[in-house]
Amino acid sequence: MIGEIKTQHFKKILTMNEKFVHWLAPLTNESLATLLDKATYKKQINNGAGVLIGFSNNADYEHKNLYWLRNKFNKFFYIDRVIIDTHSQGQGLAKKLYDDFTKEALSQGIPRLVCEVNTKPNNEASHKFHIKNGFKPVEDVHYKDSKISVRYYEKFLLDD
């Protein structure tokens, strides 16, 4: 079942985030609360077994990936992070969250979903997931101030 993220889910989210921190930005209780306060979409599935946090293009959230996307596209929903607990992977939870996120975007007339996936360190499973679910590569970017490189993806939902 998909529902809102509540403070009771924070501990599990922080634990999952830490497991995958090589692909995700680190989080604390405070930074998670701030992230959720600014997020357009913040849902969990199966009592926190998975989460998806996303932003509209005009959300009050400053981040280098969102900044890059704002310079490339006019109107979009951005997937900031999706995390599925190790024990729940392979059960279709990410797909269910993405489908729900897509419904939310369509209900607001948003023409595309966008995200980035690490290429350094490479997150091969995430690349495969996004391609399988209709996302197309946009561009590979290496940030000079970081050890991380990403590939941006987009999925068209509506004509602009």
What are these regions (language model features)?
Residues 84, 90-103, 132:
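Conserved acetyl-CoA-binding loop-helix of GNAT-fold acetyltransferases
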Residues 105-119:
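Conserved GNAT acetyl-CoA-binding A-motif
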Residues 119-139:
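Conserved active-site alpha-helix within GNAT-family acetyltransferase domains
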Residues 140-160:
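C-terminal "cap" of GNAT-fold acetyltransferases
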